[in-house]
Amino acid sequence: MALKVYNSVTQSLRQVVQVDKSELWKGRPLKKLAKGITKTGGRNNLGRITIWHRGKGHKQLYRMIDFKRRVFDIYATVERIEYDPNRTAFIALIKYDDGKFSYILSPRNLNVGDKIISSDKAEINVGNCLPLEVIPVGTIIHNIEIKPGKGGQVARSAGTYAVLLNKDSGYAQIKFRSGEVRRISLASRATVGSVSNIDHKNISYGKAGRVRWLGRRPVVRGVAMNPVDHPHGGGEGKTSGGRHPVTPWGKKTKGKKTRKNKFTSRFIVKRRN
């Protein structure tokens, strides 16, 4: 997909850069694989804000994506490539030879009419889903399971991928885009190729309103608040906050490690930092 740049007809279009979606499906999603979602605005069941900077955004339908690829040994044909407002990657509607439909993450260079399959004996082609045990070393993969059978959890955003580095003692060493190298069970499955919409990183929204459509509200700096609202608030005139950066609840931020799951740390061969 190419990038789409607009002429400066208005000030809000002057900086806009979007991904050209002219080749995508222009109709509605498949009805039985889509459902409505209720926006919470970042509030919990008590009506209190638990996640800052969340708003309503535009009304959306949630597309039910098959991250597990559990229909084995049956070929599927790519019917169309679609835009999904709930994620940065594009999605593909596939039709299995037995007549069932499913949505999957669309890999890069997957085209309408292509045949894909989820099988232990599948070829190493873009869109095919296989166990890590049978994927050759050096292959680019995405939608990787951390726990066998749980469904893909890693490398699902637009343009992302991981590389299979090594296999040893029942585990595969996978290198992520962050630089982290992690051991994952050879029984876990992954899809060959990288995720579509690689130009997503080059998008420029051009105006605040376009970001509001996505459900994001403005972010206010702590030093611009009052002391009752933030540890950096208050002071006469403009101040720097007078202390090291902290969260609104006084916890150190900007560089402080927040990882809690010590049990799985043993699977990390090389940390991203």
From Swiss-Prot:
Keyword list, A-Z: Ribonucleoprotein, Ribosomal protein, RNA-binding, rRNA-binding
The name this protein goes by in its record: Large ribosomal subunit protein uL2
Gene3D superfamilies xrefs: 2.30.30.30, Nucleic acid-binding proteins, Ribosomal protein L2, domain 3
Function: One of the primary rRNA binding proteins. Required for association of the 30S and 50S subunits to form the 70S ribosome, for tRNA binding and peptide bond formation. It has been suggested to have peptidyltransferase activity; this is somewhat controversial. Makes several contacts with the 16S rRNA in the 70S ribosome.
Entry-linked SUPFAM superfamilies: Nucleic acid-binding proteins, Translation proteins SH3-like domain
NCBIfam families xref list: rplB_bact
GO MF annotation terms: rRNA binding; structural constituent of ribosome; transferase activity
Gene field: rplB
Biological processes, Gene Ontology terms: translation
Domain of life: Bacteria
Region (Disordered): 224-260
This protein's GO CC annotations: large ribosomal subunit
Subunit structure: Part of the 50S ribosomal subunit. Forms a bridge to the 30S subunit in the 70S ribosome.
Residue ranges, compositional bias (Basic residues): 251-260
Similarity comment: family membership: Belongs to the universal ribosomal protein uL2 family.
Pfam families: Ribosomal_L2, Ribosomal_L2_C
Keyword DNA damage carried by entry: no
Secretion signal span: none
Cited InterPro entries: NA-bd_OB-fold, Rib_uL2_dom2, Ribosomal_uL2, Ribosomal_uL2_bac/org-type, Ribosomal_uL2_C, Ribosomal_uL2_CS, Ribosomal_uL2_dom3, Ribosomal_uL2_RNA-bd_dom
